[in-house]
From Swiss-Prot:
It comes from Neisseria meningitidis serogroup C / serotype 2a (strain ATCC 700532 / DSM 15464 / FAM18). Forms oligomers. One of its GO terms (cellular component) is nucleoid. The keyword Repeat applies. It holds the Pfam family MraZ. Residues 5-51, 81-124 form the SpoVT-AbrB domain. Keywords: Cytoplasm, DNA-binding, Repeat, Transcription, Transcription regulation. Its main location: cytoplasm. This is Transcriptional regulator MraZ. It is found in: Cytoplasm, Nucleoid. It comes from the Bacteria.
Length: 151
């Protein structure tokens, strides 16, 4: 599974050099390609193709007829999904349409999150980390107590 955060830069042609650690996981456990899609104006998601197929099936099974918010989210992920393959230098070309929709440009953080990768603008990632570290630990403990999660 994917883990860790890597500060990277998108080059002038829109290419991202994916760390060897992530490429190795993909080639050992999956195929050497990813599906990239837009989750929000703050980040792109990258899934191994096999994991994306599971997510896409779940998205297609969502009951969205009476829920415009869920329908828009479903459409956002499904309509923007594209398969990317590495070049010989281990880079992927991020589609121009997706780059245009996110509010980051060159300085990014590629984060491993279990079965996927997340591409954040560096400023947004830092703000997210500051917020997470500033959250009230008692409130977090209470919220975690309402779940089945055991750390």
């Amino acid at each position: 599974m994917f883990g860790g955060a890597h500060e990277l830069s998108i080059d002038s042609k829109g290419r991202l050099a994916v760390p060897a650690k992530f490429r190795d996981i993909l080639s050992r456990l999956y195929t050497p390609a990813v599906v990239v899609t837009l989750e929000s104006k703050h980040k792109l998601l990258m899934y191994p193709v096999a994991e994306w197929e599971k997510v896409a099936a779940q998205l297609l099974n969502l009951k969205v007829a009476d829920n415009p918010v869920l329908r828009r989210f479903q459409n956002l992920l499904l309509h923007n999904a594209e398969i990317l393959e590495w070049d010989s230098a281990g880079r992927v070309l991020l589609p121009a349409g997706l780059r245009k929709r996110v509010d980051f440009d060159r300085e990014v953080v590629l984060v491993g999150r279990a079965n996927r990768l997340e591409l954040w603008g560096r400023e947004q990632w830092e703000a997210e980390m500051v917020q997470a570290l500033d959250d009230d630990p008692d409130e977090l403990a209470f919220q975690l107590g309402q779940t089945d999660l055991q750390l």
